[in-house]
């Protein structure tokens, strides 16, 4: 597995990381979820699934894992896995604050998470994350930051973040929506006491939604780590999705390359020279194994799949939690 540095001064990480959004809670917005999980979505079942993924990922050389306070029990599962293994000290953990999980382990809950980017939420969730992850936490990110949230003008919040940065914690942002580029550029400008506050960004970039690419390239050129999420567009670029199914232009391109569409979608991300890490959101070891083939998959000429950003995000927003 190819290794890189997480930004200017961060730890070494693998170029493919594992995200636990899909397995830390019973409901999410990914394609094919009912078939992937079936009806057994108890906390014990998802813990075992998460541990299997972590074991397989670590054995394959993955050295970055992505969690969040809002991913149900993802941080808890990860901390228990660390304790059970007693090793894996070189696995770098990035987490996020800003959303609180309120789904109550109920797939049908009308609200699964609540967003609040206030200083009090940051302090509370940092304590919660730190209690579980401790010194293994290397990167803490504002979850789904937008310019409209006002967080970048909240001086109390910025001061609280800066206090933790001065203790050696890397700070980053994640962003979402059609205005990702604006958020990245605005966050890049934030300095506290003459020092840039953030050092990384996690954003959506995929063959259906590449609009943030220029801003992400600028951030990378400026020394930031760039982590890419939703490389398979929540399943749309897999064999089960509308854009990756057999017989579609992208499905045909994957077949010609001798890989599954998910592997080719991740390979397309890795081919961008400004990408530090691309996240696998695999829900099973088989999916992870397929995703990891991206690291050895050459990317030739691919069909043009890009949608208008507003259209892409409207489609994503309409997806049900299942």
Indicate where each model-derived feature is located:
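Short, acidic/polar
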Residues: 42-57, 115-132, 179-191, 261-265
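Short, well-ordered coil/turn segments that N-cap beta-strands
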Residues: 11-16, 61-64, 87-91, 134-138, ...
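Active-site groove signature of glycoside hydrolases
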Residues: 128-150
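Conserved, mostly hydrophobic/aromatic
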Residues: 6, 18, 65, 78, ...
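N-terminal binding-site loop/beta-alpha segment at the start of enzyme catalytic domains
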Residues: 1-92
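Beta/alpha (TIM)-barrel catalytic core signal, keyed to glycine-rich beta->alpha loops juxtaposed to Asp/Glu
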Residues: 144-322
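Active-site mouth loops of central-metabolism enzymes
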Residues: 24-48, 107-121, 148-149, 253-256
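A short, structured active-site edge motif that brings together acidic residues
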Residues: 89-103
